[in-house]
């Protein structure tokens, strides 16, 4: 997926979950930018961190910029747009290029089942698969961890997937998408959200398909790369 032209900035501070103050490196001007990722991001959003941003499409928006990438001190890139994960998976499903779901046809995105909405509904030889996608940005070395903040909604969805998987008409899966260029494995971060980690383990034990995929990330492009191990 091609990224728009990005402007180099430096992180100043974070007034709230969805807004960051940045300093342009070309004009030294301080600007406000929308932050698409509401996670804690404590390891990334440190004073002086390099942020790559794009101008807002809507000239009337309160924040004139959107934060797209963060560059770590080691030179790794991390996507700050959680929506990229679903966009990449949708493209890969449509083109049959996602190894873990080979042969499955994309039927619907944001499918409602009961009182909940799930990311994707897939079909294969009369079978139906419900798929949830999770974006992973927290990394320590080459290990990715999820979540980086408590996600009650995420745990609820995983338990609903587990219940669906026990029904004869459904199969279910969770796909963790690394949005950090250096991640080669994914683990559950139980010290941040023990309930989500418990829900994933229960899901895995009851047959929910748990998988993860890495990404190739640059300031020009982002694309899914290889299937990587998940530790549950």
Swiss-Prot record:
InterPro entries: SfsA, SfsA_C, SfsA_N. Gene3D superfamilies: 2.40.50.580, 3.40.1350.60. Transmembrane segments: none annotated. It holds the Pfam family SfsA_N. CDD domains: SfsA-like_bacterial. Belongs to the SfsA family. PANTHER family: SUGAR FERMENTATION STIMULATION PROTEIN A. This is Sugar fermentation stimulation protein homolog. The gene is sfsA.
């Amino acid at each position: 997926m091609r990224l728009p032209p990005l402007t180099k900035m430096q992180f100043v501070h974070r007034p709230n979950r969805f807004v960051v103050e940045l300093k342009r490196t070309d004009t030294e001007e301080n600007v406000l930018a929308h932050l698409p990722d509401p996670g804690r991001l404590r390891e990334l959003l440190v004073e002086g961190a390099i942020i790559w941003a794009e101008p807002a499409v809507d000239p009337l928006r309160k924040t004139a910029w959107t934060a797209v990438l963060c560059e770590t001190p080691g030179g790794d890139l991390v996507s700050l747009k959680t929506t990229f994960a679903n966009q990449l998976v949708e493209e890969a499903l449509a083109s049959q290029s996602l190894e873990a779901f080979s042969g499955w046809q994309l039927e619907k995105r944001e499918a409602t089942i009961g009182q909940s909405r799930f990311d994707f509904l897939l079909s294969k030889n009369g079978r139906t698969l419900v798929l949830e996608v999770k974006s992973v940005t927290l990394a320590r070395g080459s290990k990715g961890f999820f979540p980086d903040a408590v996600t009650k909604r995420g745990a609820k969805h995983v338990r609903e997937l587990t219940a669906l998987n026990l029904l004869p008409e459904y199969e279910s899966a969770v796909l963790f998408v690394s949005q950090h260029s250096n991640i080669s494995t994914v683990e559950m971060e139980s010290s941040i959200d023990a309930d989500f980690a418990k829900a994933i383990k229960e899901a895995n034990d009851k047959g929910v398909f748990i998988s993860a995929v890495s990404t190739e990330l640059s300031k020009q492009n982002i694309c899914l790369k290889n299937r990587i191990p998940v530790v549950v």
